[in-house]
Amino acid sequence: MKRTAVSLCLLTGLLSGCGGAGLDNAQNVRNQTQNQTKPIHVSDRNEAFNRHNENEQFGYVRYQKEQFDGEQQKTPVMNREETAHMISSLTVQLPHIQDAATLVTDREALVVYKTDSKNRELTADQVKKTAASVIPRYYHVYISDNPNHMQSVENYSNLGSGSRDIREIMSGTIQEMKTSPQGSPVSENENANGETRQDMKIDRNDKNAR
């Protein structure tokens, strides 16, 4: 009889423990499911791991489709000033580059640099690829190793995509910049500036419509 009572007590304890573990596991699953529907930001992690090695920390963010379907989300906007800063700072660190100025618009990056390179084509390709590595893929990159174009690019810095006749005004500068080496073609279907035939056709139509 005593053995039976002891066995019942042990069985009750095991069932209680399993029940508690089961509830804990279920709660963990619910928590994981809820967390998966929230964006994950690097800043959410323990800051102690990133306090002394900020430049070494990877960046990671995850979104799920329903987050944008179910509620109004603000469309991410690229900081053009910061992007221009990144391009210029990276460019000036390339071999034979002494000065670099960058203008980033809503669809292109204009990079003017001063160089003492004897291989202008190679340097142009390096500058172009550096800029392309920072901006969105659909952007076009125009470069020039003529320092005189720096002032033209700087003059546009106080303007914006909504400025009057900005496309027509900038097209002249872009055409002048393209007289400098532009590097190798981006792909079989794109020229050195990342323009396709369709892009160039649209540009011609825009000019004819003005």
From Swiss-Prot:
Cellular localisation: Cell membrane
Residues anchoring lipid (S-diacylglycerol cysteine): C18
Region (Disordered): 176-210
Lipid-attached positions, N-palmitoyl cysteine: C18
Signal peptide extent: 1-17
Keywords from the UniProt entry: Cell membrane, Lipoprotein, Membrane, Palmitate, Signal
The protein's name in its UniProt record: Uncharacterized lipoprotein YutC
Gene name for this UniProt entry: yutC
